[in-house]
Amino acid sequence: MKKPFTYNIYFLFCLLLLTGARQLMAQNETDGIMMGKNLYCVGVMTARSGWDQYWEGGLLRRNENLGTVSTKMTGAMGSLGINKKLNILFSMPYIRTSASAGQLSGFRGMQDLTVFAKYLAYRKKSGKNTFSVFAIGGLSTPVQNYVKDYLPLSIGLGSRNMILRGMLDYERNHLFTTISSSLITRSNIELDRKAYYTTQMVYSDRVDMPNVIYNNIRAGFRNKEIVAEFVADNWVTQGGFDITRNNMPFPSNRMNMTRVGINGKYEPVKWKGISLTAAFFQTVNGRNMGRASHAQFGFFYILNVSGKTGGKKN
């Protein structure tokens, strides 16, 4: 008989590394900032996410067999200005999962390598107003063959992902609004078993993974020293099925989520090239997701690969 399970925080935490965790960077794929030519931003970040309630389908409930499910992450991240219109970004996290109750052991290990190309397709300045259009593309792939089918404690789902994003940014007197939308296409994955049940019995080790639509809006204040912003995310899978009552989750479940949060960055004038970042997010609505709180901190250094320290961002 299967034990009651909750849905894995991995998908909220780890796939949102495509967005949420990289929001700690001095520049990332969901903001209107570009690194200048030959500027390289590199650093480390740490994050923790946890929940003790989850949505089983649309029902918000608890699971005493797991208690609080926690995910900790330490990651290396960076971005490089190829020129003033093209930036390359990367991230690779180390994940550790755990549950405060029950007998299930968590996992730890390197998860996925993600690389983005961010292109400034159009920018128009008129007085104090600046309007920008961006096109972003990315790929992610597992860096090891980790266990996928042990939710909610797997460190990843093991799919290879392609991300296509369009983004608009408007700024006036250092106040800004940025809106973006992404399509995330996911490859099939293979399990360590030859049969599984979704809404019917499937005699195969291969699982079709639904694609995802991800939307992001952020608004706030930014200048050369400070960024302070409110962020809202919406994540909707294009298919999948609900967790059945008191049953184990499955990698291709439907996973929908809305979360809100705040994000900040500080670049001290006296510490040229240094960026300190922090963020907090709360999941406010979901389906087959943990009702998670998420906090993260980062330290980054901007250098000029031509040999100069610090530099200018667009």
Residue map of PLM features:
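Outer-membrane beta-barrel biogenesis signature
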Residues: 23-55, 123-130, 305-314
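Outer-membrane beta-barrel strand-turn architecture
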Residues: 36, 82-86, 121-127, 170-174, ...
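Residues that define the transmembrane beta-barrel architecture of outer-membrane proteins
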Residues: 38, 70-74, 108-113, 131, ...
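Residues on the lipid-exposed face of transmembrane beta-strands in outer-membrane beta-barrel proteins
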Residues: 44-46, 76-82, 90, 115-119, ...
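Transmembrane beta-strands of outer-membrane beta-barrel pores
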Residues: 46-52, 92-98, 121, 139-145, ...
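Surface-exposed strand-loop-strand hairpins of Gram-negative outer-membrane beta-barrel proteins
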Residues: 48-73, 152-154
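Outer membrane beta-barrel transmembrane domains
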Residues: 55-57, 62-64, 201-314
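Outer-membrane pore/translocation modules
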Residues: 103-207, 252
